């Protein structure tokens, strides 16, 4: 959706193309709160206000849910290079003002937290959470010009990481840091191994 003076519009990209080697099974298919984690994260992004939800998945057939009017699929055509190829495709294809990127394996994420991330100080500026452990580039808002910046970086020294792009944005003023306090930090804890999984999202109770 185009920029309007009275509204800031953002799309979301859900990163679900990882190989999940340590987990041993596709993280996006783990059942949490009675539904696959992929579906739960799509629901949260919609509740937070995403105009369109994109999903970056591994090459091959799109995972379930395979069809929905509000979902657009991006096949990872460059496996092994991390999340940036999918992010670049979505940034180039989106006509919103910014793209909120979210890793699928953050089970305690909430629509409220996502709305905070998607609330930049001004148009053309992105936002990235920072905890005591560092920046969180896989739950961050990237302004659309980030695609052009990344293309410059690729031409100079190869495929960039989201962290490097975010750090450059902070340095140049088109990304702002959102401090995360101790109460909200669990929203950014991800699942990596089988012992991390629970059918109930962390912090929601039994």
Residue ranges and their predicted role:
Residues 203-206:
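Terminal amphipathic alpha-helical/low-complexity segments used for targeting or macromolecular assembly
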Residues 2-160, 167-187, 195, 201:
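Nucleotide and nucleotide-moiety/phosphate-recognizing core
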């Amino acid at each position: 959706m185009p920029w309007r003076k009275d509204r800031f519009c953002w799309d979301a990209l859900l990163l679900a193309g990882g190989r999940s080697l340590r987990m041993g099974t596709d993280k996006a298919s783990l059942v949490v709160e009675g539904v696959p984690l992929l579906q739960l994260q799509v629901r949260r992004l919609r509740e937070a206000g995403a105009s369109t939800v994109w999903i970056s998945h591994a090459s091959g057939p799109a995972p379930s849910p395979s069809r929905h009017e509000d979902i657009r699929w991006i096949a990872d055509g460059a496996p092994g290079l991390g999340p940036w190829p999918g992010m670049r495709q979505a940034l180039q294809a989106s006509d919103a003002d910014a793209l909120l990127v979210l890793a699928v394996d953050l089970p305690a994420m909430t629509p409220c937290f996502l709305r905070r991330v998607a609330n930049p100080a001004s148009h053309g500026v992105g936002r990235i959470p920072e905890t005591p452990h560092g920046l969180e580039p896989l739950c961050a808002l990237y302004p659309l010009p980030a695609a052009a910046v990344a293309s410059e970086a690729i031409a100079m020294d190869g495929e960039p990481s989201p962290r490097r792009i975010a750090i450059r944005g902070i340095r140049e003023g088109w990304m702002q840091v959102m401090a995360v306090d101790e109460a909200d930090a669990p929203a950014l804890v991800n699942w990596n191994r089988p012992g991390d999984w629970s059918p109930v999202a962390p912090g929601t109770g039994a």
